Amino acid sequence: MAKKSMIQRELKREKLVAKYAQKRAEFKAIILDINSTEEQIWEAQIKLQKLPVNSSASRVQRRCKVTGRPHAVYRKFGLCRNKLREYAMAGDVPGLKKASW
């Protein structure tokens, strides 16, 4: 089980990403726009750098909904491999069954 502080840190990052997503997209659009002048690009880059580091989407890490484990988390289920196997064996995940051939 992950520490509560780690789970809260990830939730805080998700909130920051949502809060600054539009600003970040606007600055990136200016930077990638062919018609932007060098001065506009520089200003956009500086403003982008001044945004909080944790507001970047790449800083958010998926965690297991049950245990908070950060590795081996299946996106489709939101569970880590251990809990997914446990729930699948108990029959709690509809449509999922153990493969045998």
Curated annotation (Swiss-Prot):
Coiled-coil boundaries: none
PROSITE patterns referenced in this protein's UniProt entry, alphabetically: RIBOSOMAL_S14 (PS00527)
One GO MF term attached to the UniProt entry: rRNA binding
Pfam families assigned: Ribosomal_S14
Gene Ontology cellular component terms for the protein in this record: cytoplasm; small ribosomal subunit
InterPro entries: Ribosomal_uS14, Ribosomal_uS14_bac/plastid, Ribosomal_uS14_CS
Keyword terms: Ribonucleoprotein, Ribosomal protein, RNA-binding, rRNA-binding
GO BP terms, alphabetized: translation
Protein family membership: Belongs to the universal ribosomal protein uS14 family.
Subunit record text: Part of the 30S ribosomal subunit. Contacts proteins S3 and S10.
Function in brief: Binds 16S rRNA, required for the assembly of 30S particles and may also be responsible for determining the conformation of the 16S rRNA at the A site.
Name of this protein: Small ribosomal subunit protein uS14
Lineage: Bacteria, Pseudomonadati, Pseudomonadota, Gammaproteobacteria, Thiotrichales
Gene encoding the protein: rpsN
